[in-house]
Amino acid sequence: MAHEQELAQAFDGQAERFEQAPTQSDPAALARLVAFAALVPGSRILDAGCGPGLLAEAFLAAGHSVHGIDLSSEMVRRARERCARFGERASFEEGSLFALDLAIAPFDGAVSRFVIHHASDPLAFVCAQVARVRPAGIVIAYDHTTDPDPLAAAWHQGIERARDRTHTRNLTPGELVDVLVKAGLGDVRLAEERFELDFDEWFDRGTPVLGKDEVRRLLLGGTARGFAPSPRPDGGLTLYCCRDMARGVLPSGPSAPSS
């Protein structure tokens, strides 16, 4: 509960910068995720950790209905404002996914985007979505991933936590697949994309533990697959990153998630 409260406060404060961030708002990336989801037309979707409604808007524009939930009241306010033109097909609530009323389920699909690296327990987070999806429904997890090498991943996570006190851990691509499988999903598919972060833009919308100069210094001391810093001639710093989208299908018959 304490972690969820910290997340709510952090994202209330960074909502405006988050909504404008190129990585979050890129229309082409959002469209690719909608296509990867491959949901049947007119599906009813749960957006877990919906933020300011960027992904919800993309699914709504594709003809689906979306119910979004987020811990941050400011994110929910922005999502409602952004998606108001879609009328009753769009609904949003402030709160924890784990407390989401099962009476409004089942959904045809559930999706989370850039959320798992803030989850205290990624498996429990995905299982909470699975519990609210109908048999044969779809669950999609999309997140920034890290290096399979433990030392490189540890360096990466140290940087992330220095820049954002709410960060827990980036999963590797394999771990992301494993979480969906352990949650009881089958036919799991994975697709990976490269993306870039500008260090200053990325740092400035975080909740840092260390100062910007110190985090920059630490960044220049290492590299990892999915998090590779590269100085630019203009004095800026680009981070070359990887994001993975994993898609699983809930079996039609009874299936128990594994622990």
Roles of regions detected by a PLM:
Residues 169-183:
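Short alpha-helix
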Residues 46, 52-99:
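Class I SAM-dependent methyltransferase SAM/SAH-binding core
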